[in-house]
Design a protein with these regions (language model features):
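Short, glycine/acidic-rich beta->alpha junctions
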Residues: 20, 165, 273
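Peripheral, non-catalytic segments of secretory and membrane proteins
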Residues: 23, 46, 204, 380-381
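Short, motif-level signal for alpha-helix interfacial/capping segments enriched in acidic residues
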Residues: 116-124, 169, 301-312
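Acidic, histidine-bearing metal-coordination/catalytic regions of metal-dependent phosphoesterases
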Residues: 1-160, 178-179
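N-terminal short leaders/motifs
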Residues: 71-84, 225-242, 289, 319-324
């Protein structure tokens, strides 16, 4: 281990090598053509980066920590002769490094089983229903939740199971409802159980999580690639809508932006912004507004739509609000607005099962017509998915 391990550029490595050969600031500056003050700043920056990882020999710090951690404190024990005989290193998560590692894992998930970047999928020659849109609604999926059946009384659930279940459900629904011009993959929020590597919700509530964050992000990247590619085989255009939930409001942002980057050169894929927790689209005379459903009651949902989407309301005659959060289906009609929450595919975790919560598990696809609003729908239950 040396300072060379903490250099990011050839210039930094050159300076460190000369410094380790015994050259001072002035001689190094003369040899490589920069000021002695620049040499000093380079070395201080490299030493600071190394010390943050636990490496600073001049301070008897030689026990390093992993790349995604920072040293919080070091306790060194010396003998009577003043020589170090033991050391205790305290570390803490480096959030910036964890984010960088997470993004690298996400990118790896995209490129898994792909030679190079995204390869366009051949569009269907025609679709039977140019005036229709198939909305594939993913209720709170809690992809990386951990549920153990002896404890919860329901099915097991982990990252691998969640991935397999969703791929099967979407495949069955696309096979049944894929003759529409547009397919909209709508994630109604809480796709991830935890918001970060702390294994907590955004509010700080600890949750039972399966898998390290990097692995989960890699799986999420690959999973959405598979789902959208499957939809592109049948629909001429695919929309991706990621609603931000209460479990994963920040994770949903990076998920959305990474998908936008991945499909940047695919004109058949449209990724909706999700900077706001409210997202909407118009399909002919149909208005659809989406929100996770957290921290807002039915009456407030209705008031928000009529107030904030007044122009869209005036242009349409069929208006819907889709939300998740409560893990089961409810339907309410209020003042010309149809409000509906959708079911989920995941079982309840230990906390919710102990509190008596649970519901029928399913995923739905709603067919919307430009002129007539909701035309029909398809649903696949968990038993059919697992069959």
């Amino acid at each position: 281990m040396s300072l060379l391990d903490y250099c990011n550029t050839d210039r930094q490595r050159q300076i460190v090598e000369l410094h380790e050969q015994g050259l001072g600031y002035t001689k190094i500056s003369q040899q490589i053509g920069i000021t002695r003050y620049s040499v000093r700043d380079y070395l201080q920056s490299i030493k600071s980066r190394a010390a943050a990882q636990g490496y600073s020999p001049e301070h008897d710090m030689t026990r390093t920590v992993p790349d995604v951690f920072k040293v919080r404190g070091v306790s060194t024990y010396y003998n009577e002769d003043g020589k170090p005989v033991g050391q205790w290193v305290k570390s803490m998560a480096d959030k910036e490094a964890m984010l960088e590692a997470s993004l690298e894992a996400f990118k790896a998930g995209f490129l898994e089983e792909i030679d190079g970047l995204y390869k366009p999928v051949k569009a269907p020659e025609s679709t039977k229903n140019e005036d229709r849109l198939s909305a594939y609604l993913i209720g709170d999926h809690h992809l990386n939740a951990l549920c153990w059946s002896p404890e919860t009384g329901g099915d097991d659930w982990d990252t691998n199971i969640a991935q397999d279940v969703l791929i099967r459900a979407v495949d069955k629904l696309v096979s049944a409802a894929g003759d529409s011009e547009v397919g909209a993959l709508i994630n109604l929020g809480d796709f991830l159980h935890a918001n970060s590597g702390d294994n907590k919700t955004a509010k700080g509530t600890p949750v039972d999580v399966d898998g390290r964050l990097g692995r989960v992000i890699r799986i999420v990247g690959n999973l959405f690639k598979v789902l959208i590619t499957r939809m592109l085989e049948t629909h001429k255009e695919v929309w991706l809508i990621n609603v931000r939930g209460n479990h994963d409001p920040d994770a949903s942002l990076w998920l959305n932006e990474m998908m936008r980057l991945y499909f940047h050169n695919e004109p058949r894929v449209k990724v909706f912004d999700n900077f706001s927790k409210w997202i909407h689209f118009e399909w002919g005379k149909t208005l659809v507004v989406m929100h996770h459903g957290d921290r807002v009651k039915t009456q407030a949902l209705y008031e928000a739509v009529t107030r904030d989407y007044a122009e869209e309301w005036g242009r349409t005659t069929h208006r819907y609000l889709y939300h998740g959060h409560i893990h089961h289906r409810t339907v309410t009609e209020l003042g010309g607005l149809h409000l509906e929450s959708f079911g989920v595919l995941c079982p309840p975790d230990s906390f919710h099962s102990a509190s008596g919560y649970g519901s029928a598990r399913s995923m739905s696809c709603v067919i919307l017509d430009k002129n007539y609003g909701e035309h029909s729908r398809f649903k696949v239950g968990i038993d059919e998915v697992k069959a």
